[in-house]
């Protein structure tokens, strides 16, 4: 119980620090998507995305919710009987990056670097046995915490040992990725590998 209370105190501090961060001038008016809505601190599986979407998590404050990427993500989780209640979800950049016209954009390397200490602290607090990166930005973000030489195109849908954990790099569930880089059938197969990693880590049975 004392350990759990310590984790909660550390997480509460992390949330407060992320909320008050002003390192990225282009995102100072955005809210960091990091709270109890990201998942349970007891999670042994952590999913890391790119950044909150304008119509999704930036609006709902729940990672991968409120937009088509979130719907796709929920469908893929359900395919291996994995519930949000069992996992923790965060992202390489905690705030929503936008273009001058207001559209979503990828976070810059500087923005990801600015957020890297939040990601590192989240990993330390939750201490997951399995880390699943969703897309190349998330995979590259891990390099700032513990070096790896993986790239998504060559390393997707394989299980690696990274930083004393199992790492599964897979593609992002966005409609654009599904239409151009990784079709639904392939992504569903990728999630079967996530289930395999979960079983390999001795956590719980995924269907």
Describe the residue ranges of each PLM region:
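A polyanion-binding, active-site-adjacent surface
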Residues: 2-154, 160-205
């Amino acid at each position: 119980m004392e350990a759990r209370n310590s984790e909660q105190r550390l997480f509460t501090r992390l949330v407060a620090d992320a909320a008050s961060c002003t390192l990225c001038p282009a995102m100072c008016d955005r809210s960091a998507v990091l709270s109890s809505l990201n998942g349970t601190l007891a999670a042994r599986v952590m999913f890391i995305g790119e950044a909150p979407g304008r119509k999704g998590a930036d609006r709902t404050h729940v990672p991968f919710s409120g937009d088509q990427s979130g719907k796709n993500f929920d469908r893929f989780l359900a395919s291996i009987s994995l519930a949000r209640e069992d996992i923790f979800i965060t992202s390489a950049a905690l705030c929503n990056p936008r273009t001058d016209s207001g559209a979503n954009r990828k976070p810059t390397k500087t923005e990801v670097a600015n957020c890297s200490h939040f990601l590192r602290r989240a990993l330390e607090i939750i201490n997951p046995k399995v880390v699943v990166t969703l897309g190349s930005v998330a995979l590259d973000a891990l390099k700032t915490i513990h070096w790896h030489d993986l790239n998504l195109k060559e390393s997707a849908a394989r299980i690696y040992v990274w930083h004393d954990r199992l790492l599964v790099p897979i593609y992002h569930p966005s409609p654009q990725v599904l239409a151009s880089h990784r079709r639904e059938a392939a992504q569903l197969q990728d999630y079967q590998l996530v289930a395999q990693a979960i079983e390999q880590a001795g956590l719980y049975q995924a269907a």
